[in-house]
Regions:
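Catalytic phosphate/metal-binding cores of nucleic-acid and nucleotide-processing enzymes, i.e., regions
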Residues: 1-143
């Protein structure tokens, strides 16, 4: 016997699938941006075995982005958020709680369809990652 679903329930299921697809696409985009910038192959972390990797270490599959080369380790724990309503506190908590030892938790986010991408990380992690040469420079005086 087939159970009938209400139109509202079907609509919620469809909305959930669209949201999941939207999130997956954003994760792929962020993996490509980071990979292109740092010359390393990154992929969206598989949620259900969609991406096979030789390394079976659980830490490799935390966060939304993983490195393909099992001889390397991604030192950032990246959570990607592509949502209309920002919940920064919860996102940061998720990134920090899920982050493996020795890695830096970051949240990459933007408001769906309406803003630039941003990165959020603790001040302590920021000062560790960004070298002095990118913060302080020599002033050039015109003659």
């Amino acid at each position: 016997m087939k159970l009938k679903t209400t139109p509202k329930k079907e609509e919620n299921v469809a909305r959930g699938k669209r949201a999941k697809r939207k999130g997956n696409n954003y994760e792929r985009l962020i993996a490509k941006i980071f990979g292109d910038k740092y010359k390393v192959e990154l992929k969206r972390t598989p949620q259900s075995g969609g991406f096979a990797k030789k390394s079976e270490k659980a830490d490799d599959f935390r966060g939304d982005i993983t490195i393909v080369d099992n001889k390397q380790v991604l030192l950032l724990h990246i959570e990607c958020k592509n949502q209309k309503n920002w919940q920064l506190k919860q996102w940061i908590e998720q990134a920090e709680e899920d982050c493996p030892e020795g890695r830096t938790p970051i949240v990459v986010f933007h408001k769906h369809n309406s803003s630039k991408d941003y990165v959020c990380l603790s001040l302590e992690d920021f000062t560790e990652l960004v070298p002095k040469s990118k913060v302080v420079g020599k002033r050039v005086f015109k003659k």
